[in-house]
Protein backbone atom coordinates (compact mmCIF):
# COMPACT_ATOMS: atom_id res chain seq x y z
CA UNK A 1 0.00 0.00 0.00
CA UNK A 2 1.18 3.51 -0.79
CA UNK A 3 -0.07 6.87 0.46
CA UNK A 4 -0.77 9.34 -2.31
CA UNK A 5 -1.13 12.93 -1.09
CA UNK A 6 -2.53 15.60 -3.39
CA UNK A 7 -1.95 19.29 -2.75
CA UNK A 8 -4.58 21.74 -3.94
CA UNK A 9 -3.52 24.13 -6.68
CA UNK A 10 0.18 23.71 -5.87
CA UNK A 11 -0.19 25.38 -2.45
CA UNK A 12 1.38 23.93 0.67
CA UNK A 13 -1.71 22.89 2.70
CA UNK A 14 0.36 22.84 5.88
CA UNK A 15 1.20 26.52 5.68
CA UNK A 16 -0.59 28.17 8.62
CA UNK A 17 -3.20 30.86 8.19
CA UNK A 18 -2.73 34.00 10.29
CA UNK A 19 -5.37 34.12 13.00
CA UNK A 20 -7.05 37.40 13.83
CA UNK A 21 -10.00 37.97 16.15
CA UNK A 22 -11.73 34.95 17.68
CA UNK A 23 -15.13 35.39 19.29
CA UNK A 24 -17.76 33.25 20.92
CA UNK A 25 -20.99 33.11 18.95
CA UNK A 26 -22.97 30.75 21.14
CA UNK A 27 -22.25 28.75 24.28
CA UNK A 28 -24.33 25.67 25.01
CA UNK A 29 -24.21 22.78 27.43
CA UNK A 30 -21.93 20.67 25.22
CA UNK A 31 -20.33 22.91 22.59
CA UNK A 32 -19.16 26.49 22.22
CA UNK A 33 -19.49 27.91 18.71
CA UNK A 34 -16.57 30.15 17.85
CA UNK A 35 -15.85 32.29 14.81
CA UNK A 36 -12.24 33.03 13.87
CA UNK A 37 -11.06 35.58 11.33
CA UNK A 38 -8.08 34.17 9.43
CA UNK A 39 -5.92 35.46 6.61
CA UNK A 40 -4.93 33.15 3.75
CA UNK A 41 -1.16 32.81 3.36
CA UNK A 42 -1.73 32.34 -0.38
CA UNK A 43 -4.06 35.22 -1.28
CA UNK A 44 -3.83 37.56 1.70
CA UNK A 45 -7.64 37.64 1.90
CA UNK A 46 -9.43 37.41 5.23
CA UNK A 47 -12.17 34.82 5.84
CA UNK A 48 -14.43 33.77 8.73
CA UNK A 49 -14.24 30.17 9.94
CA UNK A 50 -16.67 28.61 12.38
CA UNK A 51 -15.66 25.91 14.81
CA UNK A 52 -17.20 23.99 17.67
CA UNK A 53 -15.17 23.66 20.84
CA UNK A 54 -16.16 20.72 22.97
CA UNK A 55 -14.76 18.05 25.23
CA UNK A 56 -12.77 15.10 23.96
CA UNK A 57 -14.67 11.84 24.04
CA UNK A 58 -13.92 8.13 24.34
CA UNK A 59 -15.11 4.98 22.62
CA UNK A 60 -14.67 1.61 24.34
CA UNK A 61 -14.50 -1.65 22.41
CA UNK A 62 -15.11 -4.03 25.29
CA UNK A 63 -15.02 -7.84 25.38
CA UNK A 64 -15.93 -10.21 28.20
CA UNK A 65 -13.71 -13.17 29.15
CA UNK A 66 -15.96 -15.24 26.85
CA UNK A 67 -15.13 -12.84 23.95
CA UNK A 68 -18.63 -11.33 23.91
CA UNK A 69 -18.70 -7.77 22.59
CA UNK A 70 -20.42 -5.37 24.99
CA UNK A 71 -22.86 -2.97 23.35
CA UNK A 72 -25.45 -0.64 24.82
CA UNK A 73 -28.82 0.49 23.52
CA UNK A 74 -29.47 4.18 24.03
CA UNK A 75 -32.00 6.70 22.80
CA UNK A 76 -30.25 9.44 20.82
CA UNK A 77 -32.04 12.77 20.44
CA UNK A 78 -29.82 13.86 17.53
CA UNK A 79 -31.37 11.20 15.27
CA UNK A 80 -34.58 10.70 17.30
CA UNK A 81 -34.18 6.94 17.71
CA UNK A 82 -32.54 4.22 19.77
CA UNK A 83 -29.12 2.99 18.70
CA UNK A 84 -26.98 -0.03 19.49
CA UNK A 85 -23.46 1.23 20.13
CA UNK A 86 -20.25 0.63 22.01
CA UNK A 87 -19.88 2.33 25.41
CA UNK A 88 -18.45 5.83 25.34
CA UNK A 89 -18.96 9.45 26.13
CA UNK A 90 -17.39 12.82 26.89
CA UNK A 91 -14.32 13.26 29.05
CA UNK A 92 -15.04 15.19 32.22
CA UNK A 93 -12.81 18.22 32.98
CA UNK A 94 -9.48 17.12 34.47
CA UNK A 95 -10.08 13.47 33.58
CA UNK A 96 -7.61 11.53 31.43
CA UNK A 97 -9.05 9.72 28.41
CA UNK A 98 -8.33 6.35 30.07
CA UNK A 99 -10.13 7.41 33.26
CA UNK A 100 -13.07 8.55 31.12
CA UNK A 101 -13.13 5.20 29.31
CA UNK A 102 -13.14 3.28 32.61
CA UNK A 103 -15.95 5.46 33.97
CA UNK A 104 -18.08 5.24 30.82
CA UNK A 105 -17.73 1.45 30.62
CA UNK A 106 -19.05 1.02 34.18
CA UNK A 107 -21.76 3.70 33.80
CA UNK A 108 -23.16 2.35 30.55
CA UNK A 109 -22.67 -1.41 30.93
CA UNK A 110 -21.99 -2.24 34.58
CA UNK A 111 -18.80 -4.01 33.47
CA UNK A 112 -15.19 -3.27 34.45
CA UNK A 113 -11.70 -4.58 33.77
CA UNK A 114 -8.04 -3.96 34.54
CA UNK A 115 -6.94 -4.83 30.99
CA UNK A 116 -6.90 -1.71 28.81
CA UNK A 117 -5.17 -0.99 25.51
CA UNK A 118 -5.19 2.43 23.87
CA UNK A 119 -5.94 2.18 20.16
CA UNK A 120 -5.09 5.84 19.63
CA UNK A 121 -7.02 9.02 18.99
CA UNK A 122 -8.19 11.01 16.01
CA UNK A 123 -9.82 14.31 15.16
CA UNK A 124 -13.26 13.06 14.05
CA UNK A 125 -14.34 16.26 12.31
CA UNK A 126 -11.31 18.57 11.98
CA UNK A 127 -13.06 20.85 9.50
CA UNK A 128 -15.33 22.26 12.21
CA UNK A 129 -14.55 20.70 15.62
CA UNK A 130 -11.55 21.06 17.93
CA UNK A 131 -11.90 17.90 20.02
CA UNK A 132 -10.39 14.41 19.78
CA UNK A 133 -11.93 10.94 20.00
CA UNK A 134 -9.90 8.37 21.96
CA UNK A 135 -10.54 4.67 21.39
CA UNK A 136 -9.73 1.94 23.90
CA UNK A 137 -9.86 -1.84 23.84
CA UNK A 138 -11.08 -3.31 27.15
CA UNK A 139 -10.46 -7.05 27.56
CA UNK A 140 -11.71 -9.65 30.07
CA UNK A 141 -14.54 -7.42 31.26
CA UNK A 142 -16.67 -8.67 34.15
CA UNK A 143 -20.00 -7.51 35.55
CA UNK A 144 -19.22 -5.35 38.59
CA UNK A 145 -22.14 -2.99 39.17
CA UNK A 146 -25.56 -2.02 37.94
CA UNK A 147 -25.97 0.62 35.28
CA UNK A 148 -25.31 4.18 36.38
CA UNK A 149 -26.46 6.24 33.40
CA UNK A 150 -26.17 10.03 33.26
CA UNK A 151 -29.24 11.78 34.66
CA UNK A 152 -31.58 12.99 31.95
Spans of features found by a protein language model:
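N-terminal presequences and immediately downstream first alpha-helices
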Residues: 1-34
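Conserved active-site beta-strand-loop modules that form the wall/rim of enzyme catalytic pockets
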Residues: 68-69, 116, 133-135
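Conserved Nudix-box catalytic region and its N-terminal flanking loop in Nudix hydrolases
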Residues: 2-6, 15, 52-55, 59-103, ...
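Active-site-adjacent beta-strand/loop module that shapes the phosphate/pyrophosphate-binding cleft
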Residues: 34-42, 125-145
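Short, solvent-exposed loop/turn elements at beta->coil junctions and helix N-caps
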Residues: 22-24, 120-125
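Acidic, metal-coordinating catalytic segment for phosphate/diphosphate chemistry
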Residues: 21-59, 65
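Short, conserved, surface-exposed binding loops centered on an aromatic residue
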Residues: 61, 110, 125-128
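A short coil-to-beta-strand element that immediately follows conserved catalytic motifs
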Residues: 112-119
Amino acid sequence: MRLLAQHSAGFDPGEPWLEGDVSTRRDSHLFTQMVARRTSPHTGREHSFYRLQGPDWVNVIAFTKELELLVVEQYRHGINEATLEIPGGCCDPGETPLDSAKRELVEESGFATDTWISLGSCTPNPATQTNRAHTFLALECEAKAGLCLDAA
